[in-house]
């Protein structure tokens, strides 16, 4: 059987660079281990970048957007029109991720994979019309296999554009009213959990709304169970265009040797799908935060992930990942710019 592109090998970590970075950490003017996880982050980034002193100068943020047919089941507190409206807000500079991208001097790419309401061409938005959003996963498969493949490739293509300009850290974000329902459904399938354990408020549902959302997800899982035989079919039946694109981007990043900072619940579900499709990509994924959606912690546990922040976030857009970028940059700066004991003429601890 012919291998698909996402099954190709991921780049190996550079163990020589890791060893050099570990040695450097032992020589810096501080007690060994006193910077905690910042030391481990710098060492891991050294292994990813293949250099003793890593840096994160070029940040690429890609926002993938798409609508969800399951909104017809009353699973969101916001109307579906918001997806398209937010695309305009992203490129006009008014969204949270727009502000964060400016502050971080990051490239921001916005990709429209298909909104329910047709949009005029928006300057600064890449319009890739895969469909008028997904179908209602509570009633039928969310998308066709052809649509899934297009979305996976859309994620890969964004990553390749990032690589072409020398990106050294990729952040994926998402926008799509109803996408926490799709993400929770996928997480339930991936983890074998009932929806009552993973469904959350999304954009702001109350307790009754969350309970209804869980019932919709459980019904969808029962409807599609017999047809799902792996991650790709899970995406076809339960996924979203933007979730598939994120999955493709994460896989391509590992194949191209670019570190990824994963955002919240939806992005973490895409990361788990990517790891299930190609386990070698796991080393290239860093996890920004533990968000407020109840399913997020379960997905992070399945990935063996240690998130950097816990701020009660549930916005999406890549915002939590963007907030964690300064922490990674400071870890690199401390590692690369602190003096060694020899350089500073500081006495070391006696052996």
Curated annotation (Swiss-Prot):
Pfam families: DBI_PRT. It catalyses: 5,6-dimethylbenzimidazole + nicotinate beta-D-ribonucleotide = alpha-ribazole 5'-phosphate + nicotinate + H(+). GO terms for molecular function: nicotinate-nucleotide-dimethylbenzimidazole phosphoribosyltransferase activity. Coiled coil: none annotated. Its EC number is 2.4.2.21. InterPro entries: Nict_dMeBzImd_PRibTrfase, Nict_dMeBzImd_PRibTrfase_bact, Nict_dMeBzImd_PRibTrfase_N, Nict_dMeBzImd_PRibTrfase_sf. Pathway: Nucleoside biosynthesis; alpha-ribazole biosynthesis; alpha-ribazole from 5,6-dimethylbenzimidazole: step 1/2. The keyword Transcription does not apply. The active site is at 317 (proton acceptor). Keywords: Cobalamin biosynthesis, Glycosyltransferase, Transferase. GO terms for biological process: cobalamin biosynthetic process. Catalyzes the synthesis of alpha-ribazole-5'-phosphate from nicotinate mononucleotide (NAMN) and 5,6-dimethylbenzimidazole (DMB). Belongs to the CobT family. This is Nicotinate-nucleotide--dimethylbenzimidazole phosphoribosyltransferase. It comes from Ectopseudomonas mendocina (strain ymp).
């Amino acid at each position: 059987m012919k291998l698909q592109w996402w099954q190709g090998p991921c780049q190996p970590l550079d163990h020589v660079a890791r060893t050099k970075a570990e040695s450097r950490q032992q020589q810096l003017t501080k007690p060994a281990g006193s910077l905690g996880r910042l030391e481990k982050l710098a060492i891991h980034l050294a292994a990813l970048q293949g250099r003793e002193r890593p840096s994160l100068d070029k940040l690429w943020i890609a926002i993938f957007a798409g609508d969800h047919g399951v909104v017809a089941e009353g699973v969101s507190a916001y109307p579906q029109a918001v997806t398209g409206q937010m695309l305009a807000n992203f490129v006009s500079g008014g969204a949270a991720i727009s502000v964060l991208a400016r502050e971080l001097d990051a490239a921001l790419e916005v990709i429209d994979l298909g909104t329910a309401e047709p949009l005029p061409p928006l300057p600064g938005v890449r319009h890739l019309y895969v469909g008028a959003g997904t179908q209602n996963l509570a009633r039928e498969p969310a998308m066709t296999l052809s649509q899934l493949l297009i979305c996976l490739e859309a994620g890969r293509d964004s990553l390749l554009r990032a690589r072409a300009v020398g990106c050294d850290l990729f952040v994926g974000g998402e926008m799509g009213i109803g996408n926490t329902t799709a993400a929770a459904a996928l997480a339930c399938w991936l983890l074998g959990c009932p929806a009552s354990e993973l469904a959350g408020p999304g954009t702001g549902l109350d307790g009754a709304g969350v309970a209804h959302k869980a019932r919709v997800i459980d019904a969808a899982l029962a409807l599609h169970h017999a047809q799902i035989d792996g991650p790709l079919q899970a995406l076809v039946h339960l996924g979203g265009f933007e979730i598939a694109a994120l999955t493709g981007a994460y896989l391509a990043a590992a194949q191209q040797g670019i570190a990824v900072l994963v955002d919240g619940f939806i992005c973490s579900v895409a990361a788990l799908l990517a790891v299930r499709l190609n386990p070698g990509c796991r080393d290239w994924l860093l996890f920004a935060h533990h968000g407020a959606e109840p399913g997020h912690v379960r997905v992070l546990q399945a990935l063996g992930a240690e998130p950097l922040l816990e701020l009660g976030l549930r916005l999406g857009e890549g915002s939590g990942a963007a907030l964690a970028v300064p922490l990674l940059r400071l870890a690199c700066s401390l590692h690369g710019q602190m003096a060694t004991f020899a350089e500073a003429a500081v006495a070391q601890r006696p052996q």
